[in-house]
Amino acid sequence: MLGLRTHGLDRYEHYIRRPSDFGKLELQDWLNHKSFRVSPNLLIDSSTTREWNEPELFYQNTEDETWVRPCVGPKLEPSMMMLRYHDSNIGQMPQFCYPISSPINFKPVLKYILQERSELSDGFPQKYNTLIGSLFDIDKNPETLDDSDIEALDDIEMSSDSGNVKEPKIELQALEEIQQKHFSLIVSNNGIFQTGSTSITYIQSGISGSIAIKPNNVAILILLTQPSGHLLSILPLDDGKETYLLQYWNLGQKGQWNIIKHQNEKQFVLIHKELGICKFFEFHLPFTFQLVNNLTLTDSVIMNGSFFPTNYTDLDPYFIIFITAIRYERIVYFVIEWNNNEIKKKEVYQLTVFDGEKTNMTIPIGLNACLVETPLKFSLVSANQIMSGETEFHSFQLKALKGIKSFFPAPLLLLKLQELHPHTFKKFQYCTIISSSTGNICFCVTERSTIVNGNLKFYELTRFKGLKSISPLPSNPINLDSRSSSYVLVVISFSRTLELTLSLEDLRCLDKKDVIKPLKNITFKHTIDSSTEENSQILAFTSSKFYNTHTGSNINDTRNSQVWLTSPNAITQPCIDYKLRKTHQLIHLKQFQIFRHLRIWKCKNLDIALLQRLGINQSNTESSLIFATDAVSNNRIFLLDLTMTTTIDNDDPVQGLINIEDLLCDTENETILLNFTKNNLIQVTRDTIYIDPIGGDKELRKISPGWEFENVTYNDGILIVWNAGLGCVSYIENIDAVDESGALVSNLSSSKGMSKFFKQLGTVTSVNFQIKESTDDPTKYDIWILLPDCVIRTPFSDWISDSLDFSDVYILSVQQALINGPYFCSLDYESYFEVHTLQNNCFKKGSRCTSRVNFQGKDIKFRSFGVNQCLAFSAFEIFVINLTPIHDSRELDFYKLKLPHLGNNNSILEVCPDIENNQLFILYSDGLRILELSYLTSNNGNFLLKSTRSKNKKFLYLDKINRMLVLNQDLREWECIRLSDGKAVGLDSQLLKDDSEEILEIKELPIATEDNPLEKKTVLLISFTSSLKLVLLTAAKNKISNQIIDSYKLDNSRLLNHLVITPRGEIFFLDYKVMGTDNEMSFNKLKVTKHCIDQEERNNTTLRLTLETRFTFKSWSTVKTFTVVGDNIIATTNMGEKLYLIKDFSSSSDESRRVYPLEMYPDSKVQKIIPLNECCFVVAAYCGNRNDLDSRLIFYSLPTIKVGLNNETGSLPDEYGNGRVDDIFEVDFPEGFQFGTMALYDVLHGERHVNRYSEGIRSENDEAEVALRQRRNLLLFWRNHSSTPKPSLRRAATIVYEDHVSSRYFEDISSILGSTAMRTKRLSPYNAVALDKPIQDISYDPAVQTLYVLMADQTIHKFGKDRLPCQDEYEPRWNSGYLVSRRSIVKSDLICEVGLWNLSDNCKNTV
């Protein structure tokens, strides 16, 4: 590999096997405090095989000063719920979609790149490192482009080793002749992936900018910029399945870097807008770029930049860049020009636009011309105008184009327009398609003289909701056909990527106020990918309603646990631990609802004689031959042509479906086999074998052995029928060779080997035979006999010679089995799917692989689905399982089909795959449906909402009616969405609009109501600015009504935007009012009670809100959020740095109520608190000042809390090595303070907030008094024994020294909530999980005891319950089983490095 190193390694790096900043201790602390327990990165045993993010933990034995590995984990309290990491669903927020072309045979390309790298390495000078290092140390004028240090690199003599024998050189011209494959690639916020695929190339540090560039005629590269300040060059191959990093470059500055490229695809520029930096790059080799020089605009902020289109030729190659910037609070236009012959010599022109506006976007639209968008207008700017100092530009307004989002040049569209409408478009030479933030898509056409005559036209294409970006499809056949009146492009709308086919017949030229109608000119839209929304909330719940057709969020879920993500645009149900493949229904044939079994043949695969008999003259027809039977007495055969078929609502015959009446031999008896050979039709009923010659004068032959067939199997002319109960087996060696007398039918019932076999079976009647080609000789066949407890293989040659030997036995317990090529697929008796590989006609040792999907309680059937896939289906589900394991593991990958919602009783009877056309023929109870397989996705459901521009929405799942309630706070509207199909029902919004106060929150109350069997009632609580409303929701007769039951008003105070409803139906809320510099805040507890309206009629009751408990306090700060665990309130302030506990809120009086600060990690800020049960809760915390982690999950348990002075403070359960620290804290005792006379003080304020204790309470039992007395004694102790006391932090403050109290934890050591801050022994968390991305939201499903964590990049982590045994030998897993991201291959101490790194999942490389 080739690299430029900027600095040396850390001095202790050679001690580290795989260095990391994660959890690194300060080196000086490590040297000074030798008794530190944890050294996760500095002391890793080099002989281990652990991953870098699975450090071994060591501690130092103080006796002999040796480091040893701990073998015993700490005992955990029984009340501590442990949640372990289970799985993740990587988020994929699409940003851009690029058309990609790459060679089908890409191995020569990789060899060429290695050859290019080898040539670079051979010619790399030794002085290069020193020169580059000195280059970055020189302080230069940032606006000087003549960089002499970079030019000096050309003067260095390149030395190479001429003695090496090199392989034959691969020429680039040979690679250009390789056939190309075209696909679309999506760049998300954290990775790249092919459209319709769930396999993502994960970019660990994120993506801030991207562009597709083609510096050669072989393959397209993707250039990515990262927020960390790195430029990556990515080569996607094999439909995006293979992704390679070719080169990275350290840009020297973090932040947002934008990429612009020239039309020749070899020159590109990186722009850092905030810092005003431009970096100029060039592909000097087909797959390698280099930095040419830099430009820094001092005291400037760059707004936009783009290349001017130029007449680029090899004889006169020149480049012009247009940049708009703010410099000294003025709008400045820059033009940078250079010639390719003198690439480092650039000329800079600038023009100050005194009355200019900030630019939103600059778009190259013609020769040396750019379209500049400002908030009020559009301007046409040319390079010549800026160079000559002109300040008057052609300006205009255009409403449809306001807020430009993306654009691309469209030469293929211009060719179509010139062919379809020559009189209008013949004079134009340039065409650009532009999209706006309002969803409008239009195109601009210009001519060479547009700058002079101002002749540019804008024409409408369409308008599409939620538009984020657009991209071309240059390889699409419709776009390549200039005579076609349609044009296809790709759009990203919300989280979906679609192909839109647009009609070019009726195009309207846009005026400045014209509005484009939604979906205008769209003739066909096709979704090719469904990814992730920018969700803000995650909801996890278990629905009491279970539907057979519903797909849950977890694969083996039997309790209908669901996860939903919410955003202002949509609600989405993700699949956490599996993938889905969407399907598209082509047709529904109701005529087939009387049948129970199907068999499908593609007519193009049948013999020509049979096609002629069917009346088909074309051998390449796409028609299908369908055999259907009701398994009793009705046998039919149909010919279906999908190109002529239309779906109708009634049961009349459908055009394109033909009933063939004279093809079957028997239409009245149950048929168990129908097949075709080259010469014959074979039909087998329960007692007869029919052989019907397709052509010629031969007559129909019947074979009836005289006993009933239990089943039949057939393969390539070999047919076997059997009845295990009767002990009868017969076979036909070659069915085409059977004569009229049936002499070639062999009966093995009297065979000595077969007779012995049936005797050994005893009462076992479940026997199945399968005929398969031999794995070592394809001309031979084996007969596999499947029994409940074993599998037997016999060569078919032994059947012919009557020398059967059943010694080749494999002990295997199976429920179902299928042999698909070299794979033996089975369902074991634990209902797991497993595969054994066949090698040399036997089971390959150690080849057993399984899938994680469990089919327990489901009647599963297997079907072959190609060479390497198996299809497994039940009454309501279809799975496709890959038979090759994932990488080097023993796990089989699979996906589930997303089937149409057809009701809870419409079951699947049969599935017949059409692999060539990617279709499935599925026989449902209501008929035959033909589905086309579409894209893979991680979303089970994605339903768009109304009013997507309204960002303030609340979401609530209502279990009783199985609906998602969506409350639009901005428009004061609400609706209910059925989660099975997304159908929305609007609710009466009058009660929301009658109240002018702001809507804050909505919750459901777990209250049982007297339900009418025909009605379902739900009680809701809605909080406004200063009131609460109790609302009854009633669902009946497909309508949902609502009414206000009761309301609760607050006087002179406002509610916090947070409500807590406990499982017992208790209501907790917080209100506050501002009093000078303080906030008077109150925690309130309400309960819902029943009141009789009429005392005589006891049944006539209503619900009322009643205040039960109220706790008022004063605070400098505001409570940010809180939750209730049992009867304890957990709260945090607006800064989120501290966490507080109010114990026994309901059972304590104001005088005895305590507020305790809980221990938090000093670098963490609370984001959200949620209870896990009556004892435990979890805190989502943000770690903003750390480089090694971004967030934490911190777990607390309330039953372990013991109140008292902390003389033995244990360290936090952190793998980062927090030790004991002796420090001070300060307390201001208020004037007139008397020990034992007051229970609650705000020691920071020195103000009294509650009344004195009653006289009946003895002071010696006062917990606060005991604590304060101990503090006073401790104060005297330190005054007598401390020779050098620490200075006071504030005047008039009494300094209190307390052992083992760190100011990092409690800076002011007082409760902001207004009570005496009590230091406790067990207020620290019992577990913490470090995460490498910021947390967006968390949600807990108590029914299945599972925690779901939504990260900022939309990745979802799943943590499941794992109650740990209290045994000494138990060793807990590090970080609860969650492994942080792998170490990046990008080295922070290198300026650049070129190579060939495979970024596929199995290679474990990441950037």
Curated annotation (Swiss-Prot):
Region entry Required for interaction with MMS22, spans: 1-600
Coiled-coil features, chain-numbered ranges: none
Residues with Phosphothreonine modification: 1294
Signal peptide start-end: none
Gene Ontology annotations of biological process type: cell division; heterochromatin formation; nonfunctional rRNA decay; nucleosome assembly; recombinational repair; regulation of DNA replication; replication fork processing; transposable element silencing
GO cellular component: Cul8-RING ubiquitin ligase complex; nucleus
Compartments in which it is found: Nucleus
Record flagged with keyword Cell cycle: yes
Protein keywords: Cell cycle, Cell division, DNA damage, DNA repair, Nucleus, Phosphoprotein
Primary location class: nucleus
Record's subunit section: Component of multiple cullin-RING ligases (CRLs) composed of 4 subunits: the RING protein HRT1, the cullin RTT101, a linker protein MMS1, and one of many alternative substrate receptors belonging to a protein family described as DCAF (DDB1- and CUL4-associated factor). Component of a RTT101(MMS1-MMS22) complex with the substrate receptor MMS22. This complex further interacts with RTT107 and CTF4 to form RTT101-MMS1-MMS22-RTT107 and RTT101-MMS1-MMS22-CTF4 complexes respectively. Component of a RTT101(MSS1-CRT10) complex with the substrate receptor CRT10.
Function in brief: Component of multiple cullin-RING-based E3 ubiquitin-protein ligase complexes (CRLs), which mediate the ubiquitination of target proteins. The CRL associates with CDC34 as the E2 ubiquitin-conjugating enzyme. The functional specificity of the CRL depends on the type of the associated substrate receptor protein. RTT101(MMS1-MMS22) promotes fork progression through damaged DNA or natural pause sites by stabilizing replication proteins like the replication fork-pausing complex (FPC) and leading-strand polymerase at stalled replication forks.
Protein name per the record: E3 ubiquitin-protein ligase linker protein MMS1
Native organism: Saccharomyces cerevisiae (strain ATCC 204508 / S288c)
Phylogenetic classification of the source organism: Eukaryota, Fungi, Dikarya, Ascomycota, Saccharomycotina
Encoding gene (name): MMS1
